[in-house]
Curated annotation (Swiss-Prot):
Involved in DNA excision repair. Initiates repair by binding to damaged sites with various affinities, depending on the photoproduct and the transcriptional state of the region. Strongly expressed in the central nervous system and muscles. NCBIfam families: rad14. This is DNA repair protein complementing XP-A cells homolog. Zn(2+) binds at residues 126, 129, 147, 150. The gene is Xpac. It is found in: Nucleus. Keywords: DNA damage, DNA repair, DNA-binding, Metal-binding, Nucleus, Zinc, Zinc-finger. Residues 26-39 have a biased composition (Basic and acidic residues). Residues 1-39 are annotated as: Disordered. GO terms for cellular component: nucleotide-excision repair factor 1 complex; nucleus. One of its GO terms (molecular function) is damaged DNA binding. It comes from Drosophila melanogaster.
Length: 296
């Protein structure tokens, strides 16, 4: 009797299933395949929804964030890549979890993620104060191990343009670009005119050290400055004397008989006869020009 009842109860679902046409079955299969593809195309999960479900359902936040999220470790702190362009700090293990991995109720706690990417951080020692630092303006741009605090206090770490460095320390382009190690610089817009080329700013301390490498000592650099100053003064004196000479020639035309705008015509005096050579000579009256010739 009971067997008959069970067969009668199970009959209606079979009848409903048999009522589906082939077109309906094909549409159901297509919808299932489309849903499966959408599930597979979902590459990054959203930890915000998981965090909200944790608050409502009470699940462990570590286990919720471990699904479909990447963890990055920066200086010992773990961050979760949200997939939206920023990082979320990974939640800390609850205080109720013991050292053996069991919570207060004695149940096994979810494991903590340990697949973080460790980013090595190198610390440098400041040459001024001796403190260790991981990031510095001078170290990042010029490779000089000085922290930002010491850089702000000392004027030696000011910047200098390439043109000023060449004029002050008598350096050439090869001393900047080809001599090893090459001097590092930062580029900035020219404040005088934005249409001009970008300025190259160097560390003043490194420029001073490079000048000592080129000239050997500060005394030699001073001598080179004096020698170039003497040459500059000599050039100015020669230029001045040339202008003064030209001015005298223009003012005192009676001394300089050269005339630029008129053609000189000779006026010869009487002829003189040379018996030994059998030649005649006559001299210009207005200038010392003389001419010797023979008469046929």
């Amino acid at each position: 009797m009971s067997a008959e009842v069970s067969t009668n109860e199970s009959a209606p679902p079979a009848e409903k299933k048999s009522k589906l046409t082939n077109a309906q079955k094909a549409r159901i299969e297509r919808n299932q395949a489309k849903a499966q593809k959408l599930r597979e195309a979902k590459l990054v999960s959203h930890p915000f929804k998981e965090l909200a479900s944790n608050k409502e359902g009470g699940t462990h936040p570590e286990a919720a964030l471990s699904q479909g999220s990447s963890v990055i470790k920066v200086q010992g702190t773990k961050y979760i890549d949200s997939g939206g362009g920023f990082l979320l700090e990974q939640p800390v293990m609850p205080t109720g979890v013991g050292p053996a991995g069991l919570n207060k109720s004695g149940e096994e706690a979810p494991p903590i993620l340990d697949d973080a990417i460790a980013i090595p951080v190198q610390y440098e020692e400041c040459l001024e104060c001796g403190d260790m630092f991981a990031d510095s303006y001078l170290f990042n741009n010029f490779g000089h191990s000085v922290c930002d605090k010491c850089r702000d206090k000392d004027e030696r770490y000011a910047l200098i343009t390439r043109t000023e460095a060449k004029a002050e320390y008598l350096l050439k382009d090869c001393d900047f670009d080809k001599r090893e190690p090459k001097l590092r610089y930062i580029s900035r817009k020219n404040p005088h005119n934005v249409r001009w080329g970008e300025m190259k700013l160097y560390l003043h301390l490194q420029i001073h050290q490079r000048a000592l490498e080129v000239w050997g000592s500060e005394e030699e650099l001073v001598r080179q400055h004096e020698a170039r100053e003497d040459k500059r003064e000599e050039g100015k004196a020669r230029k001045y004397n040339k202008k003064m000479k030209q001015l005298r020639m223009e003012v005192r035309s009676s001394i300089y008989t050269k005339k630029t705008h008129e053609v000189h015509e000779h006026e010869f005096g009487p002829d003189t006869y040379d018996e030994e050579e059998d030649t005649y000579t006559h001299t210009c009256i207005t200038c010392p020009y003389s001419e010797t010739y023979e008469k046929m």
